[in-house]
Amino acid sequence: NNPNTRLVCEIKPSEISKARGVSVAEETVKLIRSLKAAAMVDYISFDFEILKKIKEIEPEAQVQFLNGNKSPKAIKKAGMEGIDYNHMVFKILPKWVKQAKKEGVILNTWTVNDPEMMDWFLKNEFDFITTDEPELLLQKQKSLWTEGNS
């Protein structure tokens, strides 16, 4: 067992209502607490209200916003830990990378399969990169690490 392994729990926005999404978030947190897994779970959602509710009922929870329409400064102000945005958001708004680092906001991106884009995110020291090509990304990460330590 790797104590550093984390579980990512995505709570989808409700198509029925915002209230339903918030209710699902509450029930999800209760379930994770009952499983004594709270310390190893990160929550992600495209619904900002869902994440705000999670932080309200579980202040220690690690949450990351997926939608891509809030700045790192706004995420920090809301008491959230990170942003997990589609890779194109960061290509369009590269200033958000610096802002996230300044604010201490976790940088996470998805889904990066293009080798040149992998290089860009690695060079910008993202905390997490979601990819369908993990072998290639690991190879690039090792090469970059080797270059930096020569």
Mark where each language-model region is.
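Short loop-to-alpha-helix "cap/lid" segments that border enzyme active sites
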Residues: 2-150
